[in-house]
Amino acid sequence: MKNNFAKWKPYFFLAILLLSLIPLIWLGRYNYPTGDDYYYGAETHLVWQQTGSIIQTLDAACAGVADSYQIWQGTYSALFLMYLAPNAFSNTAYHLVTFVILLLLCGGIFYLLCPLFRRFLPGTCGEWITVSSILSFLCIQTVEFQCDSFYWYNGSMYYTGFFAVTLFFLGTLFRYLDNGKRILLLPLLLFAVFLGGGNYVSLLPCMLLSVTITLLLLLQKNKKAYICGITSVVLLLSFAVSAMAPGNHVRQSGMWKIPAWKAIAKCLLQGIRYTFAWTGLWWVLAALLLLPVFLRILQKKNGAFFSHPILFTGYAYGLFCSMSCPLFYTMNSTGPGRAVAIVYYMFLLISFTVFFYWIGFVLLKMQARPNPPERIEVSGKLNTARYLAMAVLLFSILCTGLWQETSAMKAIRVLTDGEAAAYAAEYEDRLLLLNDPEVTDVVLTPFIHQPALIYTGDLPGDPEDPTSRKVAQYFQKTSLYVNYGNN
């Protein structure tokens, strides 16, 4: 019976993950575009309406990227996706945003961990599924700012989406390091060019890790250094193309920019704050769940790799803190919630990697003693203590109401209290007005229902605001704004 349960345990964790995603994806049915979704999608939407041609719509998106590169920002691949917002083609397509973002994030985590656990570590398929499911659950269910991270297309794709693609890039890089197949150079270069035009928050640690791997391979005189080196160079050049855009200087002129050394100091300090804030009940519970899995894997692994815990921890902390550098450098702050969200994902991945490494170090020291035990595992009284600790943690999570703050529970509340359906009904009424050809000057009323998770914000109250003018262009109106006077 015990062996049968152990066999099915990975699929139990996978089932919990999948079930927890259902409310989030279902809530996506009531999700609608706003703000920058209309701003960037205006030209492509009109071209699609007038021609129905994918080629001409893509051409309009490329023209938009070229224009924004000169006057606003250099993140070319991110801009391309912004101009191709789902609402440019159909509001129904916008309902799929959450599904796509969650699929990318979960897929990225599973894809990255597969070569690590199945090739570099002697892990089983079940152990890979277990670790991937638990980390995916934590990333999605315990992150704050779910609205910007999973529902608002412009913000979620720019941050969570690109972070997920970064995981796919690293997963492909690790596959190359394992099998040495040069055919992987093509996807690596495509990923590098794409990521170079994305957000700098997830790009910076990716570049640091890629360059570090290349240098280590060069020191070992490993022939794989050439492919990794080419990939790193393309990644750096793509970043340079993005960073040197004239539009960046225009945009940053209105931001509170600080010296680089001060940004580095602030991000190192912020990393400490994040670590204390995010190492909570959920993290400890996950660590206890993963402890026996990590022990099983590590006892099949050569322990020499785990002999430098301080150096490894310091490097991992540097990678983690590097994510905050672009935010402090350009904004002198931790950035918007959607940016903090991907820093949180990175914290989870790195902190559990460090946890895994330190367990390996402890095992290495234990095995170096005279007459070391043949096998170290969580059993007997130690296992009883682990189960007791997990029970206490679960009880604390229930009593403190922490479980109610998970993304799934928030989605369930919005679905069951009728707020989501009421908001969708209001939005559909607004669309009837916006699509009425006889109304050319549109004055909108604010939304009465503003459900958490799917309500990002409304349109401006000034008809001369750039966003108001873009939305008016989108719906082919003379003017458009929201009248907040009665609120």
Ranges and model annotations:
Residues 27-88, 92-98, 153, 196-339:
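Transmembrane catalytic cores of multi-pass membrane glycosyltransferases
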Residues 96-104, 137, 157, 194, ...:
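Hydrophobic alpha-helical transmembrane segments of multi-pass membrane proteins
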Residues 175-194, 226:
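Short hydrophobic alpha-helices at membrane interfaces in multi-pass membrane enzymes
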Residues 105-117, 165-177, 207-215, 288-294, ...:
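Transmembrane alpha-helical segments
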Residues 5-73, 86-128, 223-224, 366-487:
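Intrinsically disordered, polar/acidic, low-complexity terminal segments
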Residues 9-23, 130-137, 187-190, 230-238, ...:
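Alpha-helical transmembrane segments
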Residues 293-406, 410:
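Transmembrane helical hairpin unit
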Residues 36, 124-174, 199, 322-356:
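Membrane-interface micro-motifs in multi-pass membrane enzymes
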